[in-house]
């Protein structure tokens, strides 16, 4: 890929030219790990709920509120982070959403009472609600047109992987040491993903739309070099 090429191609043509290669495979693994970690956070409460109800003597209504708290947070998070990523860029949300959901997920393990746990699960959902659309956007914007639909479907498969891991951990942990270790351990993958995501560049499409052409060209050259284009 020549240094002059991005000035004469449209963005979609430039992405097609840099092709599908090592960069996109790494990005899919990074996004996919985040999706798997989010699936664990969303589903683990359903596995932990019987033990929590027994420990705190929750009513059916309280159990229902605890089970849905994360989805209420996701509703708010999807709107907030989706809007923010269109205004200031994908990368900030790409990093912070995982930190938020894994951080509050970890704090959930130390909840002293029911109300605190509900609040922390809602805040966890606020992060999860942002991770899903922001990851989808940044991954899609690095994919060539011909492979875009197929690889976005591949990304969604990581959610199923996270669900299987959550079920396996719950089966191993909850009967032996209780629900708190399950919540703590399930937050660790997200913290690792947060650390790795700091090195992912901003979406070149976002940069072009906002007039930052030189930065976009530099990133496209980086992707081309990594893919051997």
Language model regions located:
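Transmembrane-helix signature of 12-pass secondary carriers
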Residues: 1-229
């Amino acid at each position: 890929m020549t240094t002059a090429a991005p000035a004469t191609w449209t963005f979609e043509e430039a992405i097609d030219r840099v092709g599908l290669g090592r960069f996109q495979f790494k990005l899919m693994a990074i996004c996919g790990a985040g999706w798997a970690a989010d699936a664990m956070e969303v589903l683990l409460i359903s596995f932990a709920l019987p033990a929590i109800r027994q420990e705190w003597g929750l009513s059916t209504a309280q159990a229902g509120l605890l089970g849905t708290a994360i989805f209420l947070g996701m509703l708010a998070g999807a709107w907030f982070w989706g809007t923010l990523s269109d205004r200031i860029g994908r990368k900030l949300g790409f990093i912070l959403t995982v930190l938020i959901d894994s951080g509050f997920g970890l704090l959930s393990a130390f909840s002293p009472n029911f109300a605190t746990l509900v609040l922390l699960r809602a805040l966890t959902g606020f992060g999860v609600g942002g991770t899903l659309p922001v990851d989808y956007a940044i991954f899609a914007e690095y994919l060539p047109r011909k492979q875009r639909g197929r690889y976005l479907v591949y990304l969604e498969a990581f959610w199923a992987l996270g669900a299987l891991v959550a079920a396996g951990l719950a089966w191993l942990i909850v009967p032996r040491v209780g629900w708190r270790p399950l919540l703590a351990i399930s937050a660790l993958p997200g913290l690792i993903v947060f650390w790795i995501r700091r090195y992912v560049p901003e979406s070149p499409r976002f940069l072009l739309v906002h007039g930052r052409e030189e930065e976009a060209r530099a990133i496209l050259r980086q992707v081309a070099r990594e893919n051997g284009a």
